[in-house]
Amino acid sequence: NSNDPFTCTTVVTIDEAGGEIQVAANGIPNHDFTSTKGCCTNEEDYDWIFPITAVEDSDGSYESGPARGAVAVAVNGVPMFGPEDGPGGDAVALHHKYYHEDRQQIDLGICGGHSAGSTYHYHWDANCILWQPGDGEDISDYDWTKINSSIHSGIIGWSFDGYPIYGLYGWNEVADVVQVKSSYQLKASGQDGYDGTDDWEYIEGLGDLDECNGMFGPTPEYPDGIYHYVSTPISGSSNTHVDTDGSTVEMIGFPYFLMCYHGEATGGPKGGNSQPPPPGIVHPSGILAGIDSLSESWISQHIRQISGAILILIALAVGLLRKRQPET
């Protein structure tokens, strides 16, 4: 592992063909990052497929997202993973010292991301994608509590069913900006995250979101309303937890991105090390095109109307250099 930062390039390209959106990315985020214990992040060769028009699951039997592996893709082309890590525990609960890990030590780095082998991915948060540092700040100063709480958060990712994933702040029923919270909490009979998703229970009305970690409502991009998922650092549960240091802490916002697909998950990964992919992958035709560029400070968001049914947020990069923090 090097003690010296070095530069990486974030590259994302998109193409619309055959009723789908195809996104190609190298998996390098648009912010400084640490690989942590997994070591060491490499450029990948991802092809992600998304439906142009999201189709709601008609019978309500929502397909579960994979507990391990990609459930969505961030707007910078980095995969967003389910809650569990390699040993089968909740990676985010371990990061917050909810339990002792005696199988394989896992660390999460800046913005809730790390590498498993060569593949960099997020397990939670990812709000730093749209964070703008203050004077004298850099990514090492980032914390999700520094996200602007006075405005509705932007789109930070897209699920494989075509619905967007927003950052942690949204509108309530009277259009006030509030922190959106999940409706899950630890089971009293569970192992505090050691057994992964099995240690959590959904309680309707506990927070703001449904069992998939989403809700229907207006957003800046969809003023008439759309179903959307939310990145949830915190749960709506009033229960607290005593961590392994003996400190009493808030209930974290499992499942962090999404637990199940509200729509038909006909998208998914085509390449790279993002396994396991969800079922129903559709293979598109056409060539990659439509390259645009990122700003120096943070990803420029490009929103366009496609088929009058869904807005696709596109984060594209050409030649943007980013420093990588020393890997540990």
Where are these regions (language model features)?
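Solvent-exposed N-terminal domain segments of exported/luminal and surface proteins
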Residues: 1-104, 109
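Surface-exposed intrinsically disordered loops and tails
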Residues: 2-5, 25-30, 34, 88-101, ...
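Extracellular/lumenal glycan-associated surfaces
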Residues: 50, 75-78, 116-129, 222-243
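Short acidic, Pro/Gly- and aromatic-enriched capping/linker segments at domain boundaries
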Residues: 57-69, 141-156
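Extended, compositionally biased non-globular segments
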Residues: 151, 156-268, 283
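Juxtamembrane amphipathic/hinge helix adjacent to a transmembrane helix
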Residues: 276-295
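Juxtamembrane/start-of-transmembrane alpha-helix segments at the extracytoplasmic/lumenal side
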Residues: 292-310
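C-terminal membrane-anchoring or membrane-association module
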Residues: 314-328
